[in-house]
């Protein structure tokens, strides 16, 4: 074989190796394990955690229950979000917009993208926008594998009591990491999995250790943890950058 053919053969082998790496998918520790579902979970495991069932739009009234502000101190939650007036914020798993609208008052020169995978929830948000005249909340249909947000387009994303339901947490996490600007932050609010006294089903809670493991696998740093709420962690993760 002459030198030219040898070079071409080696280049072909290199390209084949690169190609196989590119299509190999996520690293081994972020692969999913599938088993039979049970009463609480879908039978899909991610980094040792079983993913819970999704609460559908039929549960919208529970999200808006009158006791929620006192039970969860949602006022403290909103006040704890590290926001600036001109931020573009994504409320992931926005549901009825329970948090989207009060957060919008904290970013008067910015906007809140209320992202949900259920069109019925977005219809509720659209109705609330029309009734209230709010101009800086935008409903956005997300997917189970992507939040459908542009790259480097948001300053902060927050997820309240929903991340544990994501059927594709690795892919969704990648999408959020890419959507955040350098230095942007992801705020994860989850019921404390370490606390047996929190009256929530096991798979609807998460420990700070588990959340940190999953977010760091995506490239985030953190978490900075604020335990100012009666039942939930506030976990702040940062995308490296400015």
State the predicted function of each range.
Residues 185-212:
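Conserved class I S-adenosyl-L-methionine
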Residues 26-84, 88:
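Class I SAM-dependent transferase core
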Residues 155-170:
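A short SAM/SAH-binding and catalytic strip from SAM-dependent methyltransferases
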Residues 170-185:
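A short glycine-rich, Lys/Arg-flanked "PGG" loop and its adjoining helix->strand segment in the class I
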Residues 147-156:
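A short acidic, Gly/Pro-enriched loop at the edge of an enzyme's catalytic core
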Residues 2-13:
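Bacterial N-terminal signal peptides that target proteins for export
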